[in-house]
Amino acid sequence: MEVWGDVIGRGASYFDPYQELVAKLGHDLDREAVLSRRKARHQEMIAELEVLPGVRDTVTAAKRLGLRLGVASSSSRAWVTGHLDRLGLQDFQCVRCRDDVANTKPDPELYLSVCACLDVAPGDAVALEDSANGIAAAKAAGMRCVAIPNPMTAGLDLSAADLRLDSLADLSLAELLERLA
């Protein structure tokens, strides 16, 4: 889990799980077979994911307030837009992914790129993050940050965030913004 904690939020190019597995086992494996099986299982699991509690309500409230919404992800554009499309989340005015920048999280470049795209000063923006690397990127960009851990990151130190919630459904957008003011 310690290895994954360091990797989460950085993007797939930072860590090779196959090499980690070979190192732990002490012998080589059929790389293509392992990667093919892993990819198939990953796709099955992803297809079952639903929108997290509170996300739709928060997006709707943000739109009602006239707030601009963006996505900053260390994942590939194909992966991100595929999930946004599948989940019916089309309300983001800007989506930036690892394909769009030289440096991914914990570097602030993704967040700075989204803020520039939205014409929002980083100090006026709020990042919702589930990883320590994402929180570090948001804070380095000069943003306020809310940690909302997922099952993989719930046990990690996310204390660098300005606020931690178990779920986005815990607070209305108005309450969240008030706590960050």
Report residues per predicted region.
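N-terminal helical cap/lid subdomain that shapes the substrate entry/recognition surface
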Residues: M1-L65, A78
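Asp-based, Mg2+/Mn2+-dependent phosphohydrolase catalytic module
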Residues: T60-K63, L67, S76-A181
